[in-house]
Amino acid sequence: MNKKVIIKNIGLIDYKEAWDYQESLFDEIVSIKDRNRKAEVQEESYNYLIFCEHPHVYTIGKSGKLENLLISEDFLKSKGATLHKINRGGDITYHGPGQIVGYPILDLDNFGVSIKNYIDGLEEVIIRALQHYDIIATRSAGATGVWLDADDPIKARKISAIGVRTSHWVSMHGFAFNINTNLDYFGYIVPCGIQGKSVTSLEKELGRKIDIEEVHQILKKEFSNVFDMEFVMK
């Protein structure tokens, strides 16, 4: 199994441009897998882990409902935001500057995980990353993502959202981890379609600005620990 992963930090990038880039890497891996089914000599495919940030944007997954966007499209535009309906699982979420978005484009056959275990693994990466800041985070029953005080109906707040797409056992999309995020933008939606729950950020929890590059390095370490990845340059 090839657990080599090419990691790229592409910085601030338009959502559609990043989506197209994901699709190209996804299609590359699927094509190699298809060729390998018929070939005597197996061709090696790479896995990818992309870190980036986006300008203000809302995305709605396949099961999402437009009524969970609480503002008109005109008001949305006045806030400098865009809206995209996309092919991941889940409902509506927000991406913006100060938020780390991670797109693992992986051949899951290489990692020996089910789709459920893969999503659990993404959550585990974030949970472990938060431990570096002495923050205890957990999963929440019946909801994806990473939460603080998940069992307290009043205090429960989400710090990382997760939504993925898989086909041919290849993954795309991934997670959004609130670091220095402007949380006001979450007030214009019902985040992930879950009523009555709030969101938070690492900055809000610690009361200070966070070095995003430091978080990148922590995430890289925990991806390696959780998925036994070997990072390579290309």
Locate each region found by the language model.
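Histidine/acidic-rich helix-loop-helix segments that form or flank divalent-metal centers
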Residues: 159-162
